[in-house]
Protein backbone atom coordinates (compact mmCIF):
# COMPACT_ATOMS: atom_id res chain seq x y z
CA UNK A 1 0.00 0.00 0.00
CA UNK A 2 2.77 2.45 0.92
CA UNK A 3 4.53 1.61 -2.35
CA UNK A 4 1.44 2.65 -4.33
CA UNK A 5 1.28 5.91 -2.39
CA UNK A 6 4.88 6.71 -3.23
CA UNK A 7 4.29 5.67 -6.84
CA UNK A 8 1.76 8.47 -7.14
CA UNK A 9 4.19 11.39 -6.99
CA UNK A 10 1.50 14.06 -6.75
CA UNK A 11 0.05 12.50 -3.61
CA UNK A 12 3.51 12.30 -2.07
CA UNK A 13 4.29 15.94 -2.88
CA UNK A 14 0.89 17.06 -1.55
CA UNK A 15 1.44 15.11 1.68
CA UNK A 16 4.90 16.64 2.12
CA UNK A 17 3.63 20.17 1.48
CA UNK A 18 0.67 19.79 3.87
CA UNK A 19 2.92 18.29 6.55
CA UNK A 20 5.48 21.09 6.31
CA UNK A 21 2.76 23.76 6.35
CA UNK A 22 1.26 22.16 9.46
CA UNK A 23 4.64 21.86 11.18
CA UNK A 24 5.40 25.54 10.61
CA UNK A 25 2.03 27.25 11.03
CA UNK A 26 0.15 25.31 13.72
CA UNK A 27 2.49 26.14 16.64
CA UNK A 28 3.00 29.84 15.79
CA UNK A 29 0.59 31.17 18.41
CA UNK A 30 1.36 28.61 21.10
CA UNK A 31 3.62 30.82 23.26
CA UNK A 32 4.22 34.47 24.03
CA UNK A 33 6.58 36.75 22.17
CA UNK A 34 10.28 36.36 22.96
CA UNK A 35 11.96 39.51 24.21
CA UNK A 36 13.56 41.71 23.08
CA UNK A 37 13.42 41.01 19.34
CA UNK A 38 9.93 39.61 18.80
CA UNK A 39 8.42 42.30 20.97
CA UNK A 40 10.27 45.02 19.06
CA UNK A 41 9.45 43.63 15.62
CA UNK A 42 5.79 43.31 16.62
CA UNK A 43 5.43 46.71 18.26
CA UNK A 44 6.71 48.64 15.24
CA UNK A 45 4.01 47.36 12.83
CA UNK A 46 1.39 47.78 15.55
CA UNK A 47 2.38 51.45 15.77
CA UNK A 48 2.31 51.70 11.96
CA UNK A 49 -1.29 50.51 11.95
CA UNK A 50 -2.22 52.75 14.87
CA UNK A 51 -0.71 55.91 13.35
CA UNK A 52 -1.41 55.12 9.69
CA UNK A 53 2.23 55.97 8.87
CA UNK A 54 3.70 53.01 6.98
CA UNK A 55 6.78 54.89 5.78
CA UNK A 56 8.62 55.79 9.00
CA UNK A 57 9.04 52.90 11.44
CA UNK A 58 8.51 54.02 15.03
CA UNK A 59 9.27 52.17 18.27
CA UNK A 60 7.60 53.74 21.29
CA UNK A 61 6.93 56.80 19.11
CA UNK A 62 10.67 57.25 18.33
CA UNK A 63 12.01 56.78 14.79
CA UNK A 64 13.58 53.33 14.41
CA UNK A 65 15.65 52.83 11.26
CA UNK A 66 17.95 50.03 12.46
CA UNK A 67 16.34 47.36 10.25
CA UNK A 68 14.78 47.33 6.77
CA UNK A 69 11.11 48.16 6.70
CA UNK A 70 9.90 45.13 4.67
CA UNK A 71 9.48 42.86 7.71
CA UNK A 72 7.44 45.58 9.42
CA UNK A 73 5.20 45.86 6.37
CA UNK A 74 4.73 42.10 6.20
CA UNK A 75 3.90 42.00 9.91
CA UNK A 76 1.49 44.92 9.56
CA UNK A 77 -0.31 43.10 6.73
CA UNK A 78 -0.42 39.99 8.88
CA UNK A 79 -1.82 41.98 11.83
CA UNK A 80 -4.50 43.50 9.61
CA UNK A 81 -5.40 40.03 8.29
CA UNK A 82 -5.25 37.87 11.44
CA UNK A 83 -5.49 40.42 14.25
CA UNK A 84 -2.77 41.49 16.66
CA UNK A 85 -1.65 38.22 18.23
CA UNK A 86 1.38 35.92 18.42
CA UNK A 87 0.32 33.88 15.38
CA UNK A 88 0.09 37.00 13.23
CA UNK A 89 3.42 38.31 14.54
CA UNK A 90 5.22 35.14 13.40
CA UNK A 91 3.25 34.46 10.22
CA UNK A 92 5.49 36.44 7.82
CA UNK A 93 8.70 34.77 8.96
CA UNK A 94 7.12 31.32 8.80
CA UNK A 95 5.85 32.09 5.30
CA UNK A 96 9.37 33.16 4.29
CA UNK A 97 10.75 29.92 5.75
CA UNK A 98 8.31 27.73 3.82
CA UNK A 99 8.85 29.69 0.62
CA UNK A 100 12.63 29.53 1.16
CA UNK A 101 12.46 25.75 1.41
CA UNK A 102 10.36 25.72 -1.76
CA UNK A 103 12.97 27.90 -3.48
CA UNK A 104 15.70 25.48 -2.43
CA UNK A 105 13.57 22.66 -3.82
CA UNK A 106 13.02 24.51 -7.08
CA UNK A 107 16.75 25.09 -7.48
CA UNK A 108 17.45 21.45 -6.65
CA UNK A 109 14.91 20.41 -9.27
CA UNK A 110 16.47 22.72 -11.85
CA UNK A 111 19.97 21.40 -11.24
CA UNK A 112 19.48 17.73 -10.37
CA UNK A 113 15.86 16.77 -11.14
CA UNK A 114 12.58 16.31 -9.29
CA UNK A 115 13.59 13.79 -6.65
CA UNK A 116 16.62 15.81 -5.57
CA UNK A 117 14.50 18.96 -5.52
CA UNK A 118 11.91 17.36 -3.25
CA UNK A 119 14.60 16.03 -0.94
CA UNK A 120 16.34 19.42 -0.78
CA UNK A 121 13.08 21.17 0.08
CA UNK A 122 12.25 18.67 2.82
CA UNK A 123 15.76 18.67 4.30
CA UNK A 124 15.83 22.47 4.30
CA UNK A 125 12.39 22.81 5.89
CA UNK A 126 13.05 20.20 8.57
CA UNK A 127 16.54 21.36 9.58
CA UNK A 128 16.39 22.26 13.25
CA UNK A 129 17.99 25.71 13.14
CA UNK A 130 16.11 26.66 9.96
CA UNK A 131 12.85 25.66 11.65
CA UNK A 132 13.71 27.54 14.86
CA UNK A 133 14.61 30.75 13.02
CA UNK A 134 11.58 30.36 10.75
CA UNK A 135 9.09 30.30 13.60
CA UNK A 136 10.19 33.40 15.51
CA UNK A 137 9.63 36.98 14.44
CA UNK A 138 13.13 38.16 13.55
CA UNK A 139 14.64 39.55 10.35
CA UNK A 140 16.95 36.59 9.64
CA UNK A 141 14.46 34.37 7.79
CA UNK A 142 13.13 37.03 5.40
CA UNK A 143 16.75 37.95 4.64
CA UNK A 144 17.61 34.30 4.02
CA UNK A 145 14.54 33.82 1.84
CA UNK A 146 15.25 36.80 -0.40
CA UNK A 147 18.95 35.89 -0.66
CA UNK A 148 18.01 32.33 -1.64
CA UNK A 149 15.54 33.51 -4.26
CA UNK A 150 17.94 36.13 -5.61
CA UNK A 151 20.92 33.81 -5.84
CA UNK A 152 18.79 31.03 -7.32
CA UNK A 153 17.41 33.41 -9.94
CA UNK A 154 20.94 34.52 -10.77
CA UNK A 155 22.09 30.92 -11.15
CA UNK A 156 19.14 29.96 -13.34
CA UNK A 157 19.58 33.10 -15.44
CA UNK A 158 23.32 32.60 -15.76
CA UNK A 159 23.09 28.92 -16.69
CA UNK A 160 19.87 29.38 -18.70
CA UNK A 161 19.63 26.97 -21.60
CA UNK A 162 23.26 25.88 -21.17
CA UNK A 163 22.43 23.43 -18.36
CA UNK A 164 23.94 20.03 -19.09
Give each language-model segment a name.
Residues 2-164:
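Membrane-integral, polyisoprenol-dependent glycosyltransferases
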